[in-house]
């Protein structure tokens, strides 16, 4: 019985730690998320690759920008996804609303589960509050 109790407590601690790792210090409003971001845009995933790093893995996602509110003047943007377990899962061919910031010391664009990045939804609160944005010309 004691072993069963110890195992149950250990499992509860692991689940609590995983849940805490996926929670955000604060829930960002659309305005605050835009202010903190270097780039805010809607884009379609061209490719998403899981790459090995010294600390494990990370996702490198290339997106074709369709509409932008901040930054991302280029036609294609590469964003790295931090927090592999909790972050948005990017899939090739799907559209996303991305809030990305510059990673300190590396200068690359990154996003994570707390940045409001999400699968595109034309009726979302984010798009209503962001307004029109700048459309990219079709090639």
State the predicted function of each range.
Residues 3, 13-139:
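Transition segments tied to proteolytic processing and entry into folded domains
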Residues 1-7:
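Sec-dependent N-terminal signal peptides
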């Amino acid at each position: 019985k004691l072993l069963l109790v110890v195992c149950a407590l250990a499992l509860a601690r692991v689940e609590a730690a995983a849940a805490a790792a996926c929670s955000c210090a604060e829930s960002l409003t659309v305005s605050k998320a835009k202010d903190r971001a270097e780039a805010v845009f809607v884009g379609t995933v061209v490719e998403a690759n899981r790459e090995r790093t010294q600390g494990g893995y990370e996702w490198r996602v290339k997106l074709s920008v369709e509409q932008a509110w901040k930054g991302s003047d280029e036609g294609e943007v590469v964003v790295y996804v931090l927090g592999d377990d909790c972050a948005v899962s990017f899939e090739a061919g799907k559209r996303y609303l991305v809030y990305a910031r510059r990673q300190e010391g590396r200068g690359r664009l990154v996003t994570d589960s707390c940045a409001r990045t999400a699968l595109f939804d034309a009726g979302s609160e984010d798009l209503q509050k962001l307004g029109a944005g700048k459309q990219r010309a079709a090639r």
